[in-house]
């Protein structure tokens, strides 16, 4: 399964406090094809506002996307583990990935696909959050502009900083009547996976959905 960087009624949230690197974890369960939003709490993990999206594409696979907004005053590293469940609660798939150097106020994206689209009824997730020690954020250095079109989105990102930004991505969730119908991930990098200082790069994404879309929500990832 490929994982990059929401689905819905939050049934439970369990907080586990890690040791050593001050990692905190929260977990939850969400149903398919809906959207959910958590509220801020007191720990580092629970100061992350999460939105989950999921949809089936062409009776072929299912997207699962989580947007995480950092409502803390720390730069954080985020790791996500997702388990897909069938209607009886049995596990049918799992995937893990994360994102680095998420600045205060930044919304970052993590996503995956599941081949077991016809078996999935809900998702369990565990979100681990720790203060970033290895990378620096680039969020405040980036200017983002985008327009939706009849078929998708056209976007540009400018690096206003003085050093190169690494692995700059925009995740795009396309919505119709509030439900996810498709997804794009756009990269803003040269051959060295960098967005150089003073450089603007543009990309286009297409929403492949017979129903079309009436809204698009984005998340930005990057580090240095």
Named regions from a protein language model:
Residues 15-18:
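C-terminal motif of bacterial Sec signal peptides marking the signal peptidase cleavage site
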Residues 90-118, 183-210:
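Intrinsically disordered, low-complexity Pro/Gly/Ser/Thr-rich segments with frequent PxxP/GP/PP motifs
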Residues 48, 77, 87-96, 135-138, ...:
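Short beta-strand and strand-turn-strand segments in soluble, beta-rich domains
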């Amino acid at each position: 399964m490929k994982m990059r960087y929401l689905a819905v009624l939050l049934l439970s949230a369990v907080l586990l406090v890690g040791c050593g690197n001050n990692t905190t974890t929260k977990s939850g369960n969400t149903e398919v094809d809906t959207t959910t939003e958590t509220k801020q709490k007191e720990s580092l993990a629970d100061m992350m506002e999460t939105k989950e999206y999921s949809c089936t594409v062409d009776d072929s696979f299912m997207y699962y996307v989580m947007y995480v907004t950092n409502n803390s005053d720390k730069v954080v590293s985020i790791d996500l583990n997702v388990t897909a469940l069938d209607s009886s609660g049995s596990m049918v798939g799992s995937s893990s990935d994360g994102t680095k150097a998420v600045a205060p106020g930044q919304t970052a994206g993590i996503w995956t696909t599941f081949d077991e689209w016809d078996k999935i009824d809900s998702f369990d997730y565990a979100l681990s959050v720790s203060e970033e020690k290895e990378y620096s954020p680039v969020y405040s250095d980036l200017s983002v502009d985008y327009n939706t079109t009849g078929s998708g989105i056209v976007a540009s990102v400018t690096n206003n900083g003085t050093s190169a930004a690494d692995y700059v991505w925009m995740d795009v969730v396309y919505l119709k009547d509030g439900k996810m119908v498709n997804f794009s991930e756009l990269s803003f990098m040269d051959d060295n996976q960098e967005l150089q200082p003073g450089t603007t790069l543009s990309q286009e994404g297409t929403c492949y959905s017979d129903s079309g879309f009436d809204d698009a929500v984005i998340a930005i990832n990057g580090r240095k």
